[in-house]
Amino acid sequence: MSINMNANFLKLLTHFRRHDLTNFKSEHDTLYEKALETGDHLEVTSHYYSVMSTVIDEYFGGNFHFVPPKFEGQKLEEALKSLHCHIAEKLELSENVHCLDIGCGIGGVMLDIADFGAKLTGVTIAPNEAEIGNEKFANMGISDRCKIVAADCQKMPFEDSTFDVAYAIYSLKYIPNLDKVMKEIQRVLKPGGKFIVYDLIKTNDYDKDNKEHYKTLHHLEYACGMPSLHTQSEVEAAAEKWEMPVVERENLEETYGNRAFHYCFSASPMFMWLVSSPVIDHTIRMAEILRILPAGFKQFNRTFLCGTVNSIVGGGRMGILSGADILLFEKKKI
């Protein structure tokens, strides 16, 4: 599937004609406030993906994470597959290797690396994502080596030392307590097993007292139902505590000629206009009034669709958000 951001933005408008969004934001607000009080974001994350997982499958090719292109004009789906294969190569995937995908969503990464021949097991907190992914695997005839389990990655239903390697792509940002998830990853990995993290992280340039910095990242965290974003040093320290020291770091923006991780959005002036223009906002409001779009769509779009894109691009441009760092860890051998 070709991922055309401009065309897909317009398709999304049609897609949401099928949804009742009147209560979505109020439910999200309630669950997000509850998450801030309890420190448990599982409910609000699941609520977010109850709608967004289908969007990600249909309009983003099954992956909602980003990567700098290797060259100007490279299609997003090609850049993502290149990233996924790059990670698979770093983990030395092959037959007789059992690999864990932590926060796998609907299995988009697993599909891209299935040809490496490894046994792939994914974990997602959202049951509807497991259903979508497993149905796709069955239709493709790869269910014998690709499977998604609906479970909490902080309490996984696997025996100790089950997996040879593991990766987490844009998923640890949903975990408030990295200590718990790193302990669990260390438990299910075999001694000497490698583990890759590729995620959105807060950079050292973030200033909590800077109103624009705070507004940008807080909106992203709120819209996606996430806790406060982690820094690279926090990720590394949490893994180190559980005897999984970092053994390699790679920033793909530097590797690929300083192109931004948000290139898929920001490289298109037309797309950025679509997600920022008051004209589009007004048009959507009129479509709501005429019942062409469902009630609540204007606010949903401003908060969860366009708002998220603008936060990602804005955070990247301010240098307070990074989304192109590969961190390779290795569990110490006994």
From Swiss-Prot:
Cross-referenced Pfam families, in alphabetical order?
Answer: Methyltransf_11
The record's note on what follows loss of this gene reads:
Mutants show impaired dauer larvae production.
**Reaction catalysis annotation:** 5alpha-cholest-7-en-3-one + S-adenosyl-L-methionine = 4alpha-methyl-5alpha-cholest-7-en-3-one + S-adenosyl-L-homocysteine + H(+)
EC number(s) for this protein? 2.1.1.-
Assigned keywords, A-Z: Cholesterol metabolism, Lipid metabolism, Methyltransferase, S-adenosyl-L-methionine, Steroid metabolism, Sterol metabolism, Transferase
Is Transferase a UniProt keyword of this protein?
Answer: yes
Q: Which SUPFAM superfamilies match?
A: S-adenosyl-L-methionine-dependent methyltransferases (SSF53335)
Q: Which GO terms describe its biological process?
A: cholesterol metabolic process; methylation; regulation of dauer larval development; sterol biosynthetic process
- Asked whether the UniProt record includes ATP-binding among its keywords, one would answer no
| A GO cellular-component term linked to this record | endoplasmic reticulum
Instruction: Please state the pathway this protein functions in, per its UniProt record.
Output: Steroid hormone biosynthesis; dafachronic acid biosynthesis
Q: What class of enzyme is it?
A: transferase
Entries under InterPro entries matching the protein? Erg6_SMT_methyltransf (IPR050447), MeTfrase_dom (IPR020803), Methyltransf_11 (IPR013216), MeTrfase_SMT (IPR030384), SAM-dependent_MTases_sf (IPR029063)
Tissue and organ expression note = Expressed in the pharynx and hypodermal syncytium.
The record's GO molecular-function terms, alphabetically, read: S-adenosylmethionine-dependent methyltransferase activity; sterol 24-C-methyltransferase activity
What family does this chain come from, according to its entry? Belongs to the class I-like SAM-binding methyltransferase superfamily. Erg6/SMT family.
Q: What does this protein do?
A: May irreversibly shunt sterols away from hormone dafachronic acid production. Dafachronic acids act as ligands and bind directly to the nuclear hormone receptor (NHR) daf-12 suppressing dauer formation and inducing reproductive growth. By reducing the biosynthesis of dafachronic acids, this methyltransferase can regulate dauer larva formation.
What name does UniProt use for this protein?
Answer: Sterol 4-C-methyltransferase strm-1
